[in-house]
Structures are given as C-alpha cells and as structure tokens.
C-alpha cells in the first residue's frame, strides 16, 4: 500500500497537478486593477480610430433614477422594439436577456415605470464598457493592438443577433463592425491567387445586413444564400457559423458552401486574405467554425446567383391545443406532404405559432423554384389537399407567383413585442428518421409535447437537396448537416425579469432539449448559431469530434493567447463562462483520467 501511495503522489506531481492547483488563473484586466487603461490611454485610442470610441451606458438608464427622463424613456421604449436600432446601437443586443447578468444588481431592464419602479438602480450587466464603432480595417487593427497591450476582454458585435450573447461580456471592449457597409458586385470575381475567375459574386462589408444585400440584389438582378431576418449581418456569425437559408438552402447549399474569400484581421492585428489558395486553414475554420473565434472578419465574398422566379404556396390549418390527437395527426400529415415535395425537389418550411390562447396555427410554405405557373403548382398539391379533406383536416391554400425572390423577403426591420425576451434552441432531423415510414408521425408527436405560447415559435428549415449534395466540400460544419433532412428551431418567449430568464434557461436545457432529442436519441446534433446556451457537450453536438479537433488545433495556432473567445466557441472550454479568466481544463482532467485508468488496472490485478 505504501508503494501505491508513493506512486500516486509521484504521478500527480509528474503532471504538475499539485502545483497547478496553487497557481491562480490568468485573467483579463478589470477596471479596478492597475493594468486598466487610464483616461489618457482611452482618449488616445479614440483619436487613433477617428473619434469612434463610445463609453457604453445602458439605454435603459433613462428609465431609472438618478437619470430618469420621462420623455427619453418613452422614446427608448419605442426604439428598443426595432431590431435595426438595436443592431446599430453599441449598448444593445437584439435581446435584453443577454444584456443582463444573473443577479438583480446586474441589469438595467428597459421597462416602463408602471411595470417596474424607476427607483430600482440601473447596472451595466453584461454590456461592454467601451465600444469601437470601426469604419475601416485600420480601426480594427488599432483596437486589437490596444486590447492585446492592455490584456482586455475583447468581444465582437456585428448586429447583436446571437442566441448566447456572444457580442457582449462584462468589463469588455467591443469591436462593433456594423458600420462596415461596402457592397460590390462582380460578374466574374477573381479570387486572390487565382486568375481563372469564379463567376458572379458579391463582396460584402462585415456590417451589411440581409435587407441591404437583398435590396442591392434587386437593383443588380442577383441573389445570395441568406436568411430571412432583415437585420442579421450576413458576414458575421450567420456566415461563419454555417448559414441556413429556408428559401435557397435546398437549391444552393449552406452559406458557407458559397463563400469564396474572407478578409480578416487576426489576433496579431495582421490583415490577411483567406481563401482556397492562401491561409487555407483560416479559410476552412471560418466556414462553419463560428464567429468571434478566429479573427475579425471585415469583409467576405460570396457567390451570386440569378434572382430566379418562383411560385410560393402555403397550406394553413388551425386547431385548439386541447384536441391533441387531431393536432398530432394534422402536423404529421403536413410533414408527410413536405417529405413528398422534397422528393420532387420542392422545398419548404413548417411554422407553428399560437395567435391566441386557444388556437394553434400551422403553416406549410412550399417553394416551387423556377416555376411561373401558379395553377400548375396548385395542381401538384391537389392530391395532398384531397387526402387531408378525407381525414377531415381542413386547410387553406394560398399561392402566388414571385418574379424575383429578393422582393419577397422582408426588407424592413422587425418590430418586437415590448419587453419580451426570447431564448432559442435547435436540433436536426436525420434523413434516416424523416424518411422512415413513421418519421413524420414521430416528429409530430415530439412537437406535440412542446408548449407553444402566444410569442413562441416552432419551425423547420429544409436541409437535404444541395446541402446534402455538397458533402464533398471540405468545410468546418458538423458532418451531420449533409445527412439531415431538416433543422428544427424552437423559440421561447421570456417575461422581463431575471427570475424568468433563469427559469427559461433551465427549462431549455433540462426539459425541452431532452424532449427534442427523444425524437432520435442516437442523433444529437444542433446548430451552433441557434443552440442551447447551456449545451455541455457543445464540441460534439455543434461540430463532431473530428471537426472540433481540427478547429481547436487551428485556434491554438492562430490565437494562442485566446484573444477571441466566444461562449460555447472553439477553445472556450479553457475559459470561464464570460471568457475573462483562463482555467485550462486539460491540465487537471488529463491526469485524473490517466489516474482513473491506472486505478482500474490495479483493481483488476
């Protein structure tokens, strides 16, 4: 026994285990520490970026004492509902949930005095202390150098559309890329390092939002693979995380399948071009590895496609939630129609909402690409509608011809309900499940277990098609993207309180994700951009072991000091929740795993 104890102690010491416990974690500089930049240094940074540095104050401060202003508070309450205003403002994310911390003294909730007394103090929460509204690559380089020199927590905000609040962190310096707005269309784009030309493409500044590129596409008669939310930045986390398009993914692939080149400022403040001919590792990582992780992307060039005509048909049914059996049967039939249409190269999206307390709506929207005859599209759907009628499932069918898809997409900023926050999560449905005889019914039964409130949303995004056909492309997305039929996104509304936020986060992780994964327990795959904010196994769920291992290797090479850390991002496992303190897991977990192995061997002998 004495020899065994000697072995254990020697083993632990050989790994540096005991000494590592004595070493405090290395943390970013905080405002109360001597390392924090003084006012002269902040002034110098501001001058170096042409006066674009903002000292961030919560927008809700005008609704609280001692800064309460009834008129200003009313204005902000109205503006805060506008997603475009939130995208452009350094002191806002798209959702108050990620502006607040976890305690009552970590928030500045933007609510009217009738809902919450104005006497309650306002706090910074998770908002950055400073934000650099960069207007050039030189600005980005200067801010990165400043953050490195002063060991500051650095975050990147594009438009603030983020399911886990990656655009903010307490006591941080923010790079706000929203104002990088250049758009340039090229009939035959020449990738750096290749003189052959890559065909039509459009180069987009990091701050270009979907509505802006869609409007530009109308004028120049092209379209791109993009999302539906008009104020999401197309070059930021959307593109770098994968980029799902409900209206063009099936026919043109994911957004990352169609990116030709990135312009990036790296962790050493170097401006580089990343494509298939230079900085290939960085280019690969930025095609699915996630935003805010490998550098600051200042522009990207993506393929442009003809803005083709289409016929859009929508089947809508309504039911009371109390009629569970009817509801499950009806949703199952709509999913069966979607599956049948997919087999005929027609893609679509199922959206489930609750317009009132007693009524649930389900709408199946189908896209007949390159079709101009509405009657022909409806004729193709008639057998399905007749079958629904036989089962006493009443639906309403509407169809329209769309000359160009850009004009069909939302071009104005979304207006959100006042005070309501949202949390969202996602999972993928495999081809194996969806294509099985009981696939649509299994999916519908799981959907029936999820609560849908008046501000909640449950919807699918069509995968398959060109996304599956692109399986030979070497990108940094989870391999399961290529073998999945649909992405399911579940959005839950949250009342404006810290308690409601805490409860909603717990329910997403402990209640609703298990329900979704029960659909196919052996197939747990989620979309990083819309994943569970508390996902414990994010490396496997978002990327898969092989892809993540390669991403982690590239991250260590390009950003060894962890300047770019984002929640549930590559390399974040070695940092605390807010990316402030370095707490390397491997130094402890590896020797413990090895010790456990040796103990098991000893027991067996």
UniProtKB/Swiss-Prot annotation:
A GO term, aspect molecular function: oxidoreductase activity
Keywords: Alkaloid metabolism, FAD, Flavoprotein, Glycoprotein, Oxidoreductase, Signal
Known cofactor(s): FAD
EC number: 1.-.-.-
Signal sequence, start to end: 1-20
Pathway: Alkaloid biosynthesis; ergot alkaloid biosynthesis
Single GO biological process annotation from the record: indole alkaloid biosynthetic process
Residues linked to a glycan: 46, 105, 370
A Pfam family recorded for this sequence: BBE
Keyword Oxidoreductase: yes
Induction: Strongly expressed in planta but not expressed in axenic culture.
Its job: FAD-linked oxidoreductase; part of the gene cluster that mediates the biosynthesis of fungal ergot alkaloid ergovaline, the predominant ergopeptine product in E.festucae var. lolii. DmaW catalyzes the first step of ergot alkaloid biosynthesis by condensing dimethylallyl diphosphate (DMAP) and tryptophan to form 4-dimethylallyl-L-tryptophan. The second step is catalyzed by the methyltransferase easF that methylates 4-dimethylallyl-L-tryptophan in the presence of S-adenosyl-L-methionine, resulting in the formation of 4-dimethylallyl-L-abrine.
Entry similarity comment: Belongs to the oxygen-dependent FAD-linked oxidoreductase family.
Protein name listed in UniProt: FAD-linked oxidoreductase easE
Source organism: Epichloe festucae var. lolii (Neotyphodium lolii)
Organism ancestry: Eukaryota, Fungi, Dikarya, Ascomycota, Pezizomycotina
The encoding gene: easE
């Amino acid at each position: 026994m004495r020899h065994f104890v000697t072995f254990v102690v020697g083993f632990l010491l050989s790994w540096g285990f005991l000494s590592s416990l004595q070493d405090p974690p290395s943390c970013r500089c905080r405002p109360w520490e001597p390392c924090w930049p003084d006012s002269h240094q902040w002034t110098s940074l501001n001058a170096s970026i042409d006066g674009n540095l903002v000292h961030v104050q919560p927008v809700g401060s005008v609704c609280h004492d001692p800064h309460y202003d009834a008129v200003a508070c009313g204005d902000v309450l109205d503006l805060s509902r506008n997603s475009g205003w939130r995208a452009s403002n350094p002191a806002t994310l798209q959702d108050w949930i990620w502006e607040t911390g976890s305690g009552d003294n970590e928030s500045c909730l933007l609510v009217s005095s009738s809902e919450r007394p104005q006497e309650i103090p306002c706090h910074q929460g998770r908002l950055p202390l400073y934000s650099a509204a960069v207007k050039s690559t030189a600005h980005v380089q200067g801010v990165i150098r400043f953050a490195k020199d002063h060991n500051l927590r650095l975050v990147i905000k594009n438009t603030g559309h983020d399911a886990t609040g990656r655009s903010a962190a307490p006591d941080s310096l923010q790079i706000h890329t929203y104002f990088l707005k250049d758009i340039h269309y090229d009939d035959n784009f020449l990738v750096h390092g290749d003189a052959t030309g890559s065909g039509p493409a459009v180069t987009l500044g990091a701050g270009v939002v979907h509505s802006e590129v869609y409007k530009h596409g109308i004028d120049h008669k092209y379209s791109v693979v993009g999302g539906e939310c008009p104020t999401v930045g197309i070059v930021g986390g959307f593109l770098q995380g994968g980029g799902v398009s409900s209206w063009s993914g099936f026919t043109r692939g994911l957004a990352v399948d169609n990116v030709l080149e990135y312009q990036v400022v790296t962790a050493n403040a170097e401006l580089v071009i990343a494509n298939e001919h230079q900085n290939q590792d960085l280019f690969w990582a930025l095609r699915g590895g996630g935003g805010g992780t490998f550098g600051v992307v200042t522009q990207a060039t993506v393929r442009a496609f003809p803005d083709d005509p289409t016929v859009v048909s929508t089947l809508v049914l309504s039911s009371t939630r109390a009629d569970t059996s009817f509801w499950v049967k009806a949703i199952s039939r709509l999913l069966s129609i979607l599956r049948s249409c997919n087999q005929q190269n027609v893609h679509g999206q199922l959206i489930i909402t609750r317009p009132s307390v007693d009524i649930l709506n389900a709408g199946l929207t189908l896209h007949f690409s390159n079709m101009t005859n509405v009657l022909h599209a409806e004729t193709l759907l008639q057998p399905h509608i007749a079958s629904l009628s036989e089962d006493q499932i009443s639906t309403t069918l509407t169809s329209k011809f769309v000359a160009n898809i850009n004009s069909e997409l939302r071009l104005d900023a979304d207006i959100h309900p006042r005070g309501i926050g949202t949390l969202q999560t996602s999972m993928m449905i495999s081809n194996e499940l969806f294509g099985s005889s009981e696939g649509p019914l299994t999916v519908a039964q799981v959907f029936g277990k999820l609560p849908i409130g008046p501000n909640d949303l449950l919807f699918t995004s069509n995968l398959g098609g060109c996304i599956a056909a692109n399986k030979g492309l070497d990108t940094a997305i989870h391999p399961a993207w290529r073998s999945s039929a649909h992405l399911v996104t579940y959005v839950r509304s949250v009342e404006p309180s810290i308690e409601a936020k805490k409860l909603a986060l717990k329910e997403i992780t402990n209640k609703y994700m298990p329900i979704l994964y029960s659909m196919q327990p052996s197939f747990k795959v989620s979309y990083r951009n819309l994943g569970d904010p508390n996902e414990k196994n994010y490396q496997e769920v978002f990327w898969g072991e092989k892809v993540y291992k390669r991403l982690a290797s590239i991250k260590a090479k390009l950003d060894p000091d962890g300047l770019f850390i984002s929640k549930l991002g590559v390399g974040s496992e070695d940092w605390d929740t807010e990316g402030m303190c370095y707490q390397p897991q491997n130094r402890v977990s590896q020797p413990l795993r090895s010790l456990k192995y040796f103990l098991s061997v000893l027991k067996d002998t």
